[in-house]
Amino acid sequence: MKFGPETIIHGDCIEQMNALPEKSVDLIFADPPYNLQLGGDLLRPDNSKVDAVDDHWDQFESFAAYDKFTREWLKAARRVLKDDGAIWVIGSYHNIFRVGVAVQDLGFWILNDIVWRKSNPMPNFKGTRFANAHETLIWASKSQNAKRYTFNYDALKMANDEVQMRSDWTIPLCTGEERIKGADGQKAHPTQKPEALLYRVILSTTKPGDVILDPFFGVGTTGAAAKRLGRKFIGIEREAEYLEHAKARIAKVVPIAPEDLDVMGSKRAEPRVPFGTIVEAGLLSPGDTLYCSKGTHVAKVRPDGSITVGDLSGSIHKIGALVQSAPACNGWTYWHFKTDAGLAPIDVLRAQVRAGMN
């Protein structure tokens, strides 16, 4: 079954997922009910009521009922997920640990838990607990053996000023103009997620054209971010009022032009080029000299692609590590060769070989 760029479905998430083709979606983002178990109104110090989550869809008669619901929707989600796909589930301390058990019991393989640190959290008005300033996201592949899930590591590193992206993300709550309001001026959905959060999830774990399923679509944050980033989406929501807000919101989204969607490619996906190939191609010759960037270590190239420094011999990586007394070394960036413009890393030569493979 081929999906159009936007598919919005009104109905029960379990029933509607069971009606979708098996193994048809690349990514699932789920923001299920939190089962907050509120015993009454939450009040501020001035006795005004906190606009908390007290909607009927968040109410379950027991933990057992919530667990049953969780396993049913996760089973339906797993059926429609491609073997190389992945799932994200977000929750608070009220539900995420119960959801995590179900995720593992049903055969998913947890890759990371992400802490969404809210830079502007709601305070604990009673002063009886720590201010709840984060939520947890579980990112999991379909199974332990699934190794080809999408992870745009280098794109995330570039987005983070060339520093490896960590598992704690500081993103503010959804406020201001981004917050969807009803006709009465009140927020249309109590747990609307910031689009920046979904932008990062989608950018990191999908490719343009992928199909993203959100079984708890709400007011369409996943759909808005997916449309903006050139991904297809399926949104399922049982509350008709939320869907009307979602449709109006998504209609206003202007997609990024397809030619502007390219991100940093993963070096792990590039063809492997042994250093010996550089010698075979004549880009370096046996007897040529390699230098570290500081000029403190000098190596000689041998015909088989190994190098020598004094009595030491081995690969560019092994010798680079030994001369630095380091546990490991990336020889491609450590060793340099002479050019008319000065020293250049031998990784430049590897790039030349790879360019010829395309």
From Swiss-Prot:
Region (Methyltransferase): 1-260
Record EC number: 2.1.1.72
Domain RAMA stretches: 259-355
Record keyword Methyltransferase present: yes
PROSITE patterns, per the entry: N6_MTASE
Region ranges (Non-specific DNA-binding): 272-358
Catalytic activity: a 2'-deoxyadenosine in DNA + S-adenosyl-L-methionine = an N(6)-methyl-2'-deoxyadenosine in DNA + S-adenosyl-L-homocysteine + H(+)
Induction statement: Transcribed from 80 minutes in synchronized cells.
Molecular function GO terms recorded: DNA binding; N-methyltransferase activity; site-specific DNA-methyltransferase (adenine-specific) activity
Binding site for dsDNA: 94, 164, 179, 267, 272, 350
Keyword Lipid biosynthesis (UniProt): no
Enzyme class: transferase
Residue ranges flagged as DNA-binding region: 31-34, 39-45, 93-94, 109-110, 122-132, 153-157, 187-193, 315-317, 330-332
Alphabetic keyword roster: DNA replication, DNA-binding, Methyltransferase, S-adenosyl-L-methionine, Transferase
Modifications the protein undergoes after translation, according to the UniProt entry: Rapidly degraded by Lon protease prior to cell division.
Residues covered by region (Linker): 261-270
Domain of life (superkingdom): Bacteria
Function: Opens a bubble in the DNA at the recognition site, allowing precise recognition of the sequence and ensuring enzyme specificity. Functions only in the predivisional cell. Responsible for 5'-GANTC-3' methylation in the cell; methylation of hemimethylated sites generated after replication fork passage occurs late in the predivisional cell, near completion of chromosome replication but prior to cell division.
PANTHER family the UniProt entry points to: RNA METHYLASE-RELATED, TRNA (GUANINE(10)-N2)-METHYLTRANSFERASE HOMOLOG
Self-association state and partner proteins as the record states: Homodimer.
Protein name according to UniProt: DNA methyltransferase CcrM
Species of provenance: Caulobacter vibrioides (strain ATCC 19089 / CIP 103742 / CB 15) (Caulobacter crescentus)
